[in-house]
Regions:
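A cytosolic small-molecule/anion-sensing beta-strand core signal
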Residues: 64-65, 81, 100
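Glycine- and acidic-residue-biased ligand/ion/polar-headgroup-sensing regions
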Residues: 57-68, 73
Length: 132
């Protein structure tokens, strides 16, 4: 038995933890989830930035259109273009800066429940700024 859908059936929205982030106002997502995996289509208009963060889930991103600058763990910046794949291991700090208009697919396992229902899991989130 299988299920069949179209992306347009799922609402496009800003993730709750990005709503107040002016650097991410152009980042929208549609997502579908099962018990074990979540797939998201990310659409970015005019660029956007998601600060470095971490979560238990493993994540894979495929850039379909556009470019993004990403960091994983060591803070070395890598630029991704259409057709590039970014693999993010569990509990590794990572961040992304979308350059202009971007379309990407993300696959996350296990699903990040916090992004589906709007709460933040305590061990999941943004890198704290260093005090000077």
């Amino acid at each position: 038995m299988g299920y069949y859908h179209r992306w347009e059936e799922f609402p496009e929205k800003t993730l709750h933890y990005l709503v107040d982030n002016p650097n991410a106002k152009g980042v929208k997502s549609r997502r579908i989830s099962t018990d074990r995996i979540m797939v998201s289509k990310v659409t970015v208009k005019g660029g956007g930035k998601i600060p470095r963060h971490y979560h238990e889930a493993e994540q894979v991103m495929l850039i379909q259109k556009g470019r993004a600058r990403v960091t994983t763990g060591d803070k070395k910046v890598h630029e991704l273009r259409s057709g590039d794949i970014w693999v993010i291991p569990s509990n590794v700090l990572h961040g992304v800066e979308y350059i202009g208009d971007v379309e990407a697919f993300e696959i996350v396992s296990p699903p990040r429940v916090d992004t589906l229902i709007g709460y933040v899991i305590p061990h999941t989130f943004f890198e704290k700024a260093k005090k000077s």
